[in-house]
């Protein structure tokens, strides 16, 4: 039994060492294609070291005006290492029926969205793609509607999860972002 315990301990130490040497945190260990783009990007490689807010979005939802607050947060804090990543989803009420090109045009022309938007994806628990499945597991909650917000610290660890009714510019969210930015 001791050899098995030793192997287990060495395995845990190897994983910890890999993360310490620039390995990827589980919440960012995914390749995702930018909206209306062709080549996936490794989230870990691009966003490592930043405070990241991941949001499932929709263009025809009562919460759609949250795009404005998300863009304002991004504009205010991006120079300090904060980024919003939007993932359109048609899972809740069929409220994101458009093509990726239509979604991109809507976001830019209606809300001036400049934060990164990614491929249309499944965010709901039943069909969650691997990114949202991992976030749901880490948070202990999956999006129940559009505009669920997951906040990751600079190491890619889940720091908070906010439901659709919590506005991106709410005091609770802003204070958490500022605490994570910490500078």
Residue ranges and their predicted role:
Residues 130-183:
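Thiol-/selenol-based redox modules, centered on thioredoxin-like
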Residues 56-60:
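Amphipathic alpha-helical repeat scaffolds
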Residues 30-51, 72-77:
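A short beta-strand-turn-helix
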Residues 18-24:
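Boundary at the C-terminal end of the N-terminal hydrophobic targeting segment
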Residues 63-128:
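Structural microenvironment flanking redox-active thiols in thiol-disulfide oxidoreductases
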Residues 48-52, 79-83, 111-116, 146, ...:
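Loop/turn elements at helix/coil->beta-strand transitions in domains of secreted/extracellular proteins
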Residues 7-16:
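Bacterial N-terminal signal peptides
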């Amino acid at each position: 039994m001791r050899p098995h315990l030793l192997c287990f301990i060495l395995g845990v130490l190897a994983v910890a060492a890999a993360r310490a040497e620039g390995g990827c945190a589980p919440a960012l260990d995914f390749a995702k294609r930018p909206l209306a783009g062709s080549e996936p990007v490794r989230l870990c490689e691009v966003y490592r070291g930043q405070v990241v807010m991941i949001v499932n979005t929709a263009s025809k939802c009562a919460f759609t005006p949250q795009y404005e607050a998300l863009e304002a947060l991004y504009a205010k804090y991006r120079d300090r290492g904060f980024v919003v990543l939007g993932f359109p989803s048609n899972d809740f009420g069929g409220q994101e029926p458009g093509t990726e090109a239509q979604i991109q045009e809507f976001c830019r022309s209606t809300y001036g969205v400049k934060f990164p938007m990614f491929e249309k994806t499944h965010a709901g628990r039943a069909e969650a793609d691997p990114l949202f499945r991992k976030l749901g597991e880490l948070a202990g909650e999956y999006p129940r509607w559009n505009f669920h917000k997951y906040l990751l610290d600079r190491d890619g660890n889940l720091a908070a999860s906010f439901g659709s009714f919590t506005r991106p510019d709410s005091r609770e969210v802003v204070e958490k972002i500022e605490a994570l930015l910490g500078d």
